[in-house]
UniProtKB/Swiss-Prot annotation:
Protein family according to the UniProt entry: Belongs to the NtaA/SnaA/DszA monooxygenase family.
Localisation per UniProt entry: Cytoplasm
Species for this entry: Rhodococcus erythropolis (Arthrobacter picolinophilus)
Protein name: Dibenzothiophene-sulfone monooxygenase
Main localisation: cytoplasm
């Protein structure tokens, strides 16, 4: 008898006020205790109780001020990134109260040196017993660059070229200690075998790193590499490096195409597609009936101010949308940008979300509900489980990112109402079968790569 294939589940939320649902902080049931370690520890314990594979935290390195070139909207209305705690520090807080749950943090490969990144994640992996993932990003805009003393953000494809070399350097550092390099022979006075600890001497186009790292090899070999870039260059990067991919897609058809496209990139890079797990994001809103759940969804979306969505959209597209009146049709804005030969991702967003006929205010409200691409599903626990299974069996993903409607209650509801249904139907684990994140995801331990002495 063939064993039922099981899905993976991941939590995803900002260490701050807003993730995808921009009105979440205003929800009557939301806790705005996001500056407290106990807040994150509660969420981590909840997801571990639900046997989730992992949770991971996004990050941005600047307050959103692209809309209006000021802080009035991004900060005043509580936009995405108004508050953003440093993710690796939050992961350490959550690792202390969990034993199995995988924990991921986002750190930019553009604005931090590889030695620092390698050391941070090697340390977290040691302290957590091999449960850590690095979500690799290349950052987004000039506002982030200026916070690191750089006037202009590196061009998109060049950022990925640099990130390729960055990953090479980080992995060399993670491999600079052999498995048995640490001896700890008290009687003989031998702490470690220096012949098994190696300089990396990386000298490339972008980076120079001597090594070795000061942290021995991870309990899971290396931290898991997670990546979320879905541009053509980002997909090639994922094909080369990613062991888990975070995808945003508005419907089953796009999810399927994204899934197949990324798996093809992994195969083209000479890697095993089964060793890269693809997650797609969904936002469940639960209720004791379909009608109640739909009412709760409508309430959640009513909390979104149009301009707070436009603040995030301005940051994502690089266009100051405050330059246009709120009643301007999107098609007129697109025509104006095209006439002025202004390159922007706004055309792609508008086409993908069928927003060309909306006004700017309507698009802002829509974007603020789910950043345009995260499906919002309203239903009972049984109905949400049905949708997850339908998409899983339909080839949408290997697993799902559960984006919270509000925190921390959305995760409590999901674990109590959806997870048991998935478990009863054989689509999700009832117990953890291993200790490391690689165990949970079914990923092989990377072979130790040799280093020069």
């Amino acid at each position: 008898m063939t064993q039922q294939r099981q899905m993976d589940l991941a939590g995803f939320f900002s260490a701050g006020n807003v993730t995808h649902a921009h009105g979440a902080w205003r929800h009557t049931d939301a806790s705005n205790d996001f500056l407290s370690g106990k807040y994150y520890q509660h969420i981590a314990r909840t997801l571990e109780r639900g046997k989730f594979d992992l949770l991971f935290l996004p990050d941005g390195l600047a307050v959103e001020d692209s809309y209006g070139d000021n802080l009035d909207t991004g900060v005043g209305l509580g936009g995405q990134g108004a508050v953003a705690l440093e993710p690796a520090s939050v992961v350490a807080t959550m690792a202390a109260v969990t034993e199995h749950l995988g924990l991921g943090a986002t750190i930019s490969a553009t604005y931090y040196p590889p030695y620092h990144v390698a050391r941070v994640f090697a340390t977290l992996d040691q302290l957590s017993g091999g449960r850590v993932s690095w979500n690799v990003v290349t950052s987004l805009n000039d506002a982030e660059a200026r916070n690191f003393g750089i006037n202009q953000h590196l061009e998109h494809d060049a950022r990925y070229d640099r990130a390729d070399e960055f990953l090479e350097a980080v992995k060399k550092l993670w491999n600079s200690w052999d498995e048995d390099a640490l001896v700890l022979d008290k009687a003989a006075g031998v702490f470690a075998d220096p012949a098994k600890v190696h300089y990396v001497d990386h000298h490339g186009e972008w980076l120079n790193v001597r090594g070795p790292l000061q942290v021995p090899r991870s309990p899971q070999g290396e931290p898991v590499i997670l990546q979320a870039g879905l541009s053509p260059r980002g997909r090639r990067f994922a094909g080369k490096w990613a062991e888990a991919v975070f995808s945003l897609a508005p419907n089953l058809e796009v999810m399927q195409a994204t899934y197949q496209g990324i798996k093809a990139e992994v195969d083209a890079a000479g890697r095993d597609p089964d060793q890269t797990k693809i997650f797609t994001a969904v936002m469940p809103v639960l209720g004791e009936s379909q009608a109640v759940a739909q009412e709760r969804l409508e309430y959640l979306n009513s909390l979104v101010h149009p301009e707070v969505g436009l603040s995030t959209l301005s940051s994502h597209t690089g266009i100051n949308l405050a330059a246009y009146p709120l009643d301007t049709p999107i098609k007129d804005i697109l025509r104006d940008l095209q006439d002025r030969n202004v390159p922007t991702q706004l055309h792609m967003f508008a086409a993908a979300t069928h927003s060309e006929e909306l006004t700017l205010a309507e698009m802002g409200r829509r974007y603020g509900t789910n950043v345009g691409f995260v499906p919002q599903w309203a239903g009972t626990g049984e109905q949400i489980a049905d949708e997850l299974i339908r998409h899983f069996e339909g080839g949408a993903a290997d697993g799902f990112i559960i984006s919270p409607a509000f925190l921390p209650g959305s995760y409590d509801e999901f674990v109590d109402q959806v997870v048991p249904v998935l478990q009863d139907r054989g689509y999700f684990r009832t117990e953890y079968q291993g200790n490391t994140l690689r165990d949970h995801l079914g990923l092989r331990v990377p072979q130790l790569q040799g280093q020069p002495s």
